[in-house]
C-alpha cells in the first residue's frame, strides 16, 4: 500500500505543538486509536489536523474541505493508496471534470463524498498517456479511425488537416480533459459511492499479512492470538509447509511501535505468545503503560519486547504527566502543596527544574505519560536480572 501524505494531528483544546503527532497516511485503525491516545483525546471533534506534505495526489490539496473528519480523510487516502499510475491519472482527470461541472452549475466546493466517489470510479475512464494537447488528440482520433467522416480523404490531404481544431471539437463534445500525465475521458456513467460501513471493533491484538516466497498470488491474513489449528490453516492457504516458506508483507499491532519490529516469520510462535500477553495487558489496564515503556526504553528486537513485558512491574508510569509543565506542577504540589506551590510556580525556571527532576528520577516523558525505572536506574539500560524480585514500586514525588 502506497503512502499518500504526512499529516499532523493535534488536540484542538491545546496550543502545545509538542503534544501533536505526525502520521503517514493512510493509517490502520489501531494507529489512529494510538494517535488519539497520544494527544489525550477521544472525540474526533476535538482533533485538529493538517496535511504537511503530499507524496502523491498533490492536486487534492485545494479541495480538502475544512469540515472533513480525520476518519473520512483516512478512508480517502486508503482508496487512493491502492491506485496504480493509470488510475492516478484518471483520478486527476475526473477531479478536473468535477471542478468544471461545479463551476458551470455554481455548486460550491467539492465535497468529501465526491472525492471518494471519484476515487471509486477511476476504472470508468480512458487514459491516453501520450496525448497532451488538442493537436495530439486530433491526430489520435484521425489516425485510429475514430473520425469516419474523414476516412474517404486521400492520404495527401491528411497533412492539411487542422488537428488542433479537430481535437478541440472532440474534447469538448465528450467533456474530456488534459492532465500533466495524459488525456482523460469518461467511458461510463459514474457510480454512486457505496453505503458507508462503520468500523467494527477490533478483536485481534496483531494482524499479520503473509505471502508465499515463490508465489505472490498465495496470500493470507492471520489474526493473533490464534490457535494452532488456525495457524496450520494459514500455512495451507499459503502453500507453505514451513513458516520460512512465507514472509510478512504487513503488520498491524495494537502497539504500533511493534509494526516495525515484527519482521521475521520464523518468530511467529513467539509473536503469537506476545499477542496473548498483549490481550492480558489490555484486560488489566496495563497496555498504555507498556506502550510508554516500549517507547522510552529503546526496544529494537523481539527479545527486548519480551524483556519489557517480563519486567513491566519494575517500571513506574504516570499517565497524567505528559509534559514538563505537568511535571513541575505535580512535583511542587508533592513537596510544598497549596499556595506555596502556586507562588513558587509563578517565579520558577520551569524548564531547568523539570530537566533536573527528570534527571533525578532517571525518567523520560512520552506521549502516553512519564516513565522511569523503579530503582531509578538508567532507562536505556536493561534492568538486571537480580533486581526483578523488587515487586513494589517506590513512590516518587508525584
Locations of regions flagged by a protein language model:
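Short, extreme N-terminal segment that most often corresponds to the first beta-strand
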Residues: 1-31, 200-228, 393-398
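Residue-level signal for functionally critical sites in structured catalytic/ligand-binding pockets
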Residues: 10-12, 72, 139, 164, ...
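Helix N-cap / beta->alpha transition motif
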Residues: 24, 162, 349, 372-373
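Mixed-charge (acidic/basic) macromolecular-recognition segments
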Residues: 36-157, 183-205, 216-217, 223-342, ...
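Conserved, folded interaction/cargo-binding domains in eukaryotic regulatory proteins
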Residues: 148-176, 335-363
Amino acid at each position: 500500500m502506497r503512502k499518500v501524505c504526512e499529516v499532523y494531528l493535534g488536540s484542538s483544546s491545546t496550543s502545545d505543538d509538542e503534544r501533536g503527532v505526525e502520521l503517514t497516511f493512510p493509517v490502520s485503525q489501531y494507529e489512529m486509536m494510538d494517535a488519539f491516545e497520544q494527544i489525550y483525546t477521544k472525540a474526533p471533534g476535538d482533533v485538529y489536523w493538517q496535511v504537511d506534505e503530499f507524496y502523491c495526489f498533490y492536486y487534492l490539496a485545494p479541495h480538502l474541505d475544512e469540515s472533513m473528519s480525520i476518519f473520512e480523510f483516512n478512508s480517502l487516502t486508503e482508496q487512493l493508496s491502492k491506485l496504480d499510475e493509470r488510475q492516478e491519472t484518471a483520478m486527476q482527470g475526473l477531479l478536473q471534470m468535477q471542478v468544471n461541472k461545479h463551476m458551470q452549475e455554481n455548486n460550491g466546493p467539492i465535497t468529501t463524498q465526491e472525492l471518494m466517489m471519484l476515487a471509486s470510479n477511476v476504472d470508468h475512464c480512458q487514459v491516453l498517456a501520450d496525448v497532451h494537447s488538442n493537436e495530439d488528440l486530433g491526430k489520435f482520433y484521425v489516425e485510429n479511425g475514430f473520425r469516419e467522416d474523414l476516412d474517404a480523404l486521400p492520404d495527401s490531404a491528411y497533412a492539411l488537416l487542422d488537428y488542433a481544431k479537430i481535437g478541440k471539437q472532440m474534447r469538448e463534445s465528450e467533456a474530456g480533459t488534459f492532465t500533466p500525465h495524459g488525456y482523460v475521458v469518461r467511458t461510463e456513467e459514474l457510480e454512486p459511492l457505496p453505503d458507508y460501513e462503520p468500523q467494527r471493533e477490533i478483536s485481534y491484538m496483531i494482524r499479520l499479512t503473509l505471502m508465499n516466497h515463490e508465489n505472490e498470488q498465495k496470500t493470507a491474513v492471520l489474526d493473533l492470538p490464534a490457535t494452532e489449528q488456525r495457524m496450520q490453516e494459514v500455512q495451507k492457504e499459503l502453500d507453505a509447509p514451513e513458516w520460512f516458506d512465507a514472509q510478512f508483507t504487513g503488520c498491524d499491532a495494537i502497539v504500533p511501535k511493534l509494526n516495525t519490529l515484527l519482521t521475521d516469520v520464523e518468530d511467529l510462535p513467539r509473536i503469537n505468545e506476545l499477542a496473548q500477553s498483549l490481550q492480558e495487558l489490555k484486560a488489566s489496564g496495563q497496555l498504555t503503560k507498556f506502550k510508554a515503556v516500549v517507547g522510552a526504553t529503546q526496544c529494537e528486537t523481539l527479545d527486548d519486547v519480551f524483556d519489557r513485558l517480563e519486567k513491566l512491574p519494575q517500571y513506574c508510569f504516570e499517565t497524567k504527566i505528559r509534559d514538563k509543565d505537568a511535571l513541575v506542577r505535580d512535583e511542587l504540589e508533592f513537596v510544598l502543596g497549596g499556595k506555596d506551590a502556586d507562588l513558587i510556580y509563578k517565579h520558577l525556571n520551569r524548564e531547568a527544574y523539570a530537566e533536573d527532576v527528570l534527571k533525578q528520577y532517571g525518567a523520560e516523558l512520552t506521549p502516553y505519560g512519564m516513565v522511569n525505572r523503579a530503582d531509578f536506574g538508567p532507562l536505556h539500560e536493561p534492568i538486571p536480572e537480580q533486581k526483578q524480585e523488587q515487586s513494589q514500586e517506590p513512590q516518587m514525588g508525584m
